[in-house]
UniProtKB/Swiss-Prot annotation:
SUPFAM superfamilies: NusB-like. InterPro entries: NusB-like_sf (IPR035926), NusB_fam (IPR011605), NusB_RsmB_TIM44 (IPR006027). GO terms for cellular component: cytosol. Belongs to the NusB family. The keyword Transmembrane does not apply. This is Transcription antitermination protein NusB.
């Protein structure tokens, strides 16, 4: 399966881990999707989910200056997760920033409010500079 589908599963895993009553570990959360999606790139999913969780404070510090009158805590959970995922991938992978940004915009269109993809794209455009 494609990286795009793996990013969707990474997003859903991170969303699940953000639930207030969740005591799941990263490996437990990922194991829930393995049975239904054996063709996903689980190495990539684990790398992305672990990287975002392990570097959350640094990612938030990187993102915050570009939020214009917003704070990380005030963002929708979906937007916060997508920004963290994309920022981590831009900073820690060889994937071209343009590809990562496009995937983040597509995730936003799929999982967030109508026009939030413009906000996500604007923040990520500043981060990649």
């Amino acid at each position: 399966m494609s990286r795009k589908e793996s990013r969707v599963q990474a997003f859903q895993t991170l969303f699940q881990l953000e639930m207030k009553d969740s005591d799941l570990t990263i490996n437990e959360a990922i194991s829930f999707i393995k049975d239904d999606n054996p063709d996903l790139d689980f190495e990539f999913i684990h790398w992305l989910v672990s990287g975002v969780k392990d570097h959350e404070p640094v990612l938030d510090e990187t993102i915050s200056p570009y939020l214009k009158d917003w704070t990380i805590a005030r963002l929708l959970k979906t937007d916060r997760i997508i920004l963290r995922m994309a920022t981590y991938e831009i900073l820690h992978s060889d994937t071209p920033a343009k590809v990562v940004m496009n995937e983040a915009v597509e995730l936003t269109k799929q999982f967030s409010d109508d026009d939030h993809y413009k906000f996500i794209n604007g923040v990520l455009s500043n981060i990649k500079k």
